[in-house]
Amino acid sequence: MRSLVCTLDIQSPVHFIGAGGIGMSALARILLSRGHRVSGSDRRLSPAMESLKTAGMVAFESQAAANFQALDRLDRSSPIVVISSAIPDHNPELVAARERQLEVWHRSDLLAALIDQQPSIAIAGSHGKTTTSTVVTTLLHGAGEDPTAVIGGIVPCYDSNGHAGQGRLLVAEADESDGSLVKFRASLGVITNLELDHTDHYRDLDDLIATLQRFGDGCKRLLANQDDPILSEHFQADAWWSVQRSDNVDFAGLPVALEGDRTIADLYEQGTFVGQITLPMPGLHNLSNTIGALAACRMEGVPLEHLISHLSELKTPGRRFDYRGDWQGRQIVDDYAHHPSEVAATLNMANLMVSSGRSPLPRSPQRLVAVFQPHRYSRTQEFQTEFARALLSAELVLLAPIFAAGEAEMPGVNSEALASVMQELSTQQSVLVASTMDELVSLVKEHSLPDDLVLAMGAGDVNSLWSRLSQSSSEGQASCPPALAA
């Protein structure tokens, strides 16, 4: 491995507004590791903020104009201010920064600058980009490449979403939600799939396709998923991968066995069989993500044998079928699924564990209970029927209130309406609706059974279900999770 340590030509301090966010904290961590003077604020000192504070960041527990006065006293005046799309124009700290005429960067500007510093793999797509980015990072790490990584989830091999590596490559997750990924000029762009989402930003599917085409055009080379009909029709890629065919694609992994705790597949390069692989994670979607990741590493010149030998070490990133623990015989799992296709794929994987009797969990579950928190009113309105169909595969569905993510309420758009559509589609469907998170916890307690898999899905605060259950347990029966392969 050739060492290549890259530093940005930034002499000023850097201040992150909303530093605790998953994308912002990764960037802050990398700048800290590379010796930059970093400060950051958020509404509370979350675990991410505490971790950054331990790493040397000056941390503020509020987003207030007074933070800049405090930085003046610390001789950190006139910082470059970094924001994400989640920070509104009326944010008091951002207003103060502009009144001071400070330089304000969007987080994508900073990530684009990092990408420009060294050969980079930027991974985009509607679904699977965090998992694919994590697998690329894990395989490169195992192969001795020590990549820099900027990921939208916790990468198990680093226990972090940001890692300042010494190797030649940078791996970045390219978020399409606000269109800012068109700024990236990566050595290799990867697109996992494409489906309409983020209707608060995109007019329609054509608008989303055009944005991803601009991303692809900005990359020196493009790798894409041949199995995705939108990609195969609308994109010109330098290389393609598939889990459905081995002919006329550059990389393929054809499933031999899809089991509840693992996936076995035949691996092909340029149509030639090169060996059989076993992944310690279930699901056809995870196989596709892994084949895409293997293809990206191969296109960057990493020997195949160095990659295959580390497949057994793969783990999904945090909040991707993340086993949290056992509560009175119920196995609690957290997943970030918040689009109908993601919900369907996650439930299919969970149902396979129930039906096959094989599972990466401590015990094979006997029944699936889906706990779903819709994310954003706009997404729930756009995909209400699709969400309802996807959720029907669970024996029991518990719905949390919609997580607004800053959006205003929309008349008639709520979890009760989603439940009504589910019952219109299937009169036999068992679905219950909670009006608060506390009521959701009560529903789980009352209606779940020992040996159930309780699968909490959503991009909001439904991931607090495990902690709420364990804190409310008066019998002290909650137990910490053991290490899992997936």
From Swiss-Prot:
Compartment(s) where it occurs, according to its Swiss-Prot or TrEMBL record: Cytoplasm
GO cellular component: cytoplasm
Alphabetized UniProt keyword annotations: ATP-binding, Cell cycle, Cell division, Cell shape, Cell wall biogenesis/degradation, Cytoplasm, Ligase, Nucleotide-binding, Peptidoglycan synthesis
Gene Ontology terms: biological process: cell division; cell wall organization; peptidoglycan biosynthetic process; regulation of cell shape
Coiled-coil ranges (or none): none
Catalytic reaction equation(s): UDP-N-acetyl-alpha-D-muramate + L-alanine + ATP = UDP-N-acetyl-alpha-D-muramoyl-L-alanine + ADP + phosphate + H(+)
Main location: cytoplasm
Leading EC class: ligase
Keyword Nucleotide-binding: yes
One example GO MF annotation: ATP binding
Entry-linked InterPro entries: Mur-like_cat_sf, Mur_ligase_C, Mur_ligase_C_dom_sf, Mur_ligase_cen, Mur_ligase_N, MurCDEF_pg_biosynth, UDP-N-AcMur_Ala_ligase_MurC
Matching PANTHER family: UDP-N-ACETYLMURAMATE--L-ALANINE LIGASE, UDP-N-ACETYLMURAMATE--L-ALANINE LIGASE-RELATED
Function: Cell wall formation.
Family according to the record: Belongs to the MurCDEF family.
Protein name: UDP-N-acetylmuramate--L-alanine ligase
Species the sequence originates in: Synechococcus sp. (strain WH7803)
